[in-house]
A protein has these predicted regions:
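N-terminal helical cap/lid subdomain that shapes the substrate entry/recognition surface
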Residues: 21-32, 36-121, 128-133
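Residues at secondary-structure transition points
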Residues: 91-95, 99, 114-121, 142, ...
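Conserved phosphate-coupling serine/threonine residues in phosphotransfer and NTP-handling enzymes
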Residues: 35, 141-143
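A structural preference for short, pocket-lining loop segments at secondary-structure junctions
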Residues: 135-137
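Asp-based, Mg2+/Mn2+-dependent phosphohydrolase catalytic module
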Residues: 2-17, 21-25, 128, 144-146, ...
Length: 250
């Protein structure tokens, strides 16, 4: 059953169930893009700047990018775009897709390094509360390790990565979300049962990945995912963001 976490429901009950994460909970596993920070718009900008750099007359609007986000992974997103734009693979072989994506990653990292992002409301406080209460922290994402490291270092400083007991990225596994691979790898490394973890996600693909791994999911809808179907989520955060109290953390 889905439990709603929102400003007017925190501490209340929903059909007899409290709207806080039930103990035992030993680990909180975060997605990155859209969850820790509203970075998807920065990704879109980096894609478009990459296309312009290579002389391609492609422009990914917000509406188009919202559709493309249903496909996990940047390289996979480009391939999906090519297929649906009717561009034959012999005209745009996979080697070019890899080159494009590598340049886009470099551009995205430079944008992050220039400070053009903020953590989403409540993220910093939730992480601090989890640390105070002895929870393990981990990351399960389809983005690249370079992107993760840059964002964490920019938000928390050079030692920020040390807060996370495990970080699993899309290139570390065979299948990206909605497959459960990143989550299965995280809980394997943590040595903690899936039922003793909580995943924080912003998208339906992320929710499906965590649920397929047997992990309860709390959703924080983001700019590009507010219209997603989250009917399988265990909890949904409200407008105040990732409130630690909503997860039962003092």
């Amino acid at each position: 059953m889905q439990r709603s976490i929102s400003p007017n429901l925190v501490g209340a009950t929903n059909n007899g169930h409290e709207n806080t994460v039930m103990t035992p909970c030993k680990a909180i596993i975060f997605d990155v893009d859209g969850t820790l920070s509203e970075t998807e718009e920065i990704h879109r900008r980096a894609f478009n700047e990459t296309f312009d750099h290579f002389g391609l007359d492609w422009n990914w609007t917000q509406d188009l990018y919202r559709e493309l986000l249903l496909v996990s992974g940047g390289k996979e997103r480009i391939r999906h775009f090519l297929d649906h734009a009717g561009i034959p693979r012999d005209r745009f072989p996979d080697e070019l897709t890899i080159v494009l994506h590598a340049f886009k990653t470099e551009r995205y990292v430079r944008l992050l390094e220039s400070g053009q992002f903020d953590l989403r409301p409540g993220v910093r406080e939730l992480i601090a509360a989890a640390q105070r209460n002895g929870y393990h922290l981990a990351i399960a994402t389809t983005t690249s390790r370079e992107n993760v490291e840059c964002l964490i270092a920019g938000a928390f400083g050079p030692d920020g990565l040390d807060m996370f007991a495990s970080i699993v990225c899309g290139d570390d596994v065979a299948r990206k979300k909605p497959a459960p691979d990143v989550y299965l790898r995280v809980i394997e490394r943590l040595g903690i049962a899936a039922s003793d973890c909580v995943a924080i996600e912003d998208s339906r693909n992320g929710m499906l990945a965590a649920k397929s791994a047997g992990i309860p999911v709390a959703i924080t809808p983001a700019f590009y995912t507010r219209g997603d179907d989250f009917s399988g989520a265990d909890w949904i955060f409200g407008e105040n963001g990732l409130e630690a109290s909503a997860l039962g953390l003092p």
